[in-house]
Amino acid sequence: RCHGTAHIWIARANEKSGCEVLLQKRSAWKDSNPGCYDISSAGHLSAGDTYLEGALREIGEELGIHAEAEELRDLGLLEKVSHGVFYGKPFHDHEVSAVYLYTKPVEAEKLHLQESEVEAVRWMDLKECQKAVREGSIPNCIDIRELEMIEKSTTPYVYNDSNYKRVQYTRYAD
């Protein structure tokens, strides 16, 4: 059965490649991917939630950011299907994720991290992050397609760009 998730990337301008993203390090207590670097903020939708409502809730719960709807830029949808074994039982996941970009100024050291979810956060240059994810040089559970969506979006660090056109990315995982 398919379920929805909201993925919120926090980005800011930098001089190196033009953009850097805020990564969260998942809590060591998480069932899945403990201690791995991940999306700035993400979570499953609650019953009746829209993607946007879920995104606003998650960024508030995990990082203490009280964003407004117009501050989240919709980058599109991603579909992911995965199969495996989780705690000795077959695991089948089919999710559709709405990917958002938040570019208002954020000071990582002033965030209020939800300890049960987030161990730490760090800024990383977008190009370096893409390379690290492709090479597996940092422990991560990041879908490279999301970093590509950020890169392909027009000037991702410009807040509320009215010339932006919604792009939908959909591809099944192997």
Model features per residue range: what roles?
Residues N14, S27, L78:
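Short, flexible active-site-adjacent loop segments at beta-strand->alpha-helix junctions, enriched
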Residues G35-Y37, S41, L78-D174:
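Nudix hydrolase/Nudix homology domain
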Residues R1-H7, S17-E62:
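Conserved Nudix-box catalytic region and its N-terminal flanking loop in Nudix hydrolases
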Residues A13-E20, K89:
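Short, solvent-exposed loop/turn segments that connect beta-strands within catalytic domains
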Residues E15-K16, G64-E68, E107-K110:
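Secondary-structure boundary elements
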Residues A11-A13, T103:
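A generic structural motif
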Residues I10, G64-H66, K89-H92:
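Short, conserved, surface-exposed binding loops centered on an aromatic residue
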Residues H66-L77:
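A short coil-to-beta-strand element that immediately follows conserved catalytic motifs
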